[in-house]
Regions:
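Phosphate-binding chemistry for phosphorylated carbohydrates and sugar-nucleotides
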Residues: 1-158, 171
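Catalytic-core signal marking the mid-to-C-terminal active-site face
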Residues: 155-251
């Protein structure tokens, strides 16, 4: 068995997710390095999400954990067909999954949509970057502990560190900018915004993605750009966000 050191495990009814867990993993990062631990595991308040921290203090997100679970299934000789991510799943995850010989599909953001697509395709593995992972061959919903145990079992079986295990997946730099909406218009229909998106996609030349989507909970447009060149990605995201902001103010 493993020696386990727990932190953030003193609930008082008010401190759920307060500076701890998968939504605030900074303290876990520090503790892993201080203790010289092999890894750290962070759950959110209701336990359906999980992130990990490797021995160097690097955060391992839901995309990387889902990739490891897919690898573990293949190493056990299981036929899983494919993996479902979302519109926000890192492009590096998609490429890594396909390199394993698996299909990959994207659902809308939200675990309910991941589950719907899994059922549609008859697959068993899907999840979000936030660490909400669904393994229908193990449980019927997202369960952080179940997901974590599968990763830990795979690391033990392969006798490999978490850091080395995720080395097979190269995450693309990703920039997200939230642009507040001012009125009732739709900036995404603006000709200037659409032109900025087209120009960005041309510069990425098939090795990146541009995504604009309205927030489901706030009056925001989320601008996401990812690609191989971090400086270019940042520049393109800011250019598009500026056009969205201009269009929002004019609406």
């Amino acid at each position: 068995g493993a020696e386990v050191i727990t932190i953030g495990d003193k609930p008082d009814g008010l401190n759920i997710n307060l500076d701890c867990g998968s939504t605030h993993p900074e303290h876990l990062v520090t503790r892993v390095k201080v203790e010289g631990a092999d890894l750290g595991v962070a759950f959110d308040g209701d336990g359906d999400r999980v992130l990990m921290v490797d021995h160097q203090g690097e955060i391992v997100d839901g995309d990387e954990l889902l990739y490891l679970i897919a690898r573990s299934r293949l190493s056990d000789g299981e036929d899983i067909g494919g993996v479902v991510g979302t519109l926000m799943t890192n492009l590096g995850m998609e490429l890594a999954v396909k390199s394993l010989g698996l299909d990959f599909a994207r659902s809308k953001v939200g675990d309910r949509y991941v589950l719907e697509m899994l059922n549609e395709k008859g697959w068993t593995l899907g999840g979000e970057s936030s660490g909400h992972i669904i393994c229908l061959d193990r449980t019927t919903t997202g369960d952080g502990i179940v997901s974590a145990l599968q990763v830990l079992a795979y690391l033990a079986k392969e006798n490999i560190s978490l850091h080395d295990a995720v080395g097979g997946m190269n995450k693309f730099p990703q920039v997200m900018i939230n642009v507040p909406l001012q009125g009732s218009g739709d900036p995404m229909q603006s000709a200037a915004v659409q032109q900025a998106v087209e120009q960005a996609e041309a510069k990425l030349d098939g090795r990146g993605r541009v995504l604009l989507r309205p927030s489901g909970t706030e009056p925001l447009i989320r601008v996401m750009v990812e690609g191989e060149d971090e400086l270019l990605v940042s520049q393109l995201a800011n250019d598009i966000a500026a056009q969205v902001e201009n269009a929002a103010q004019a609406a």
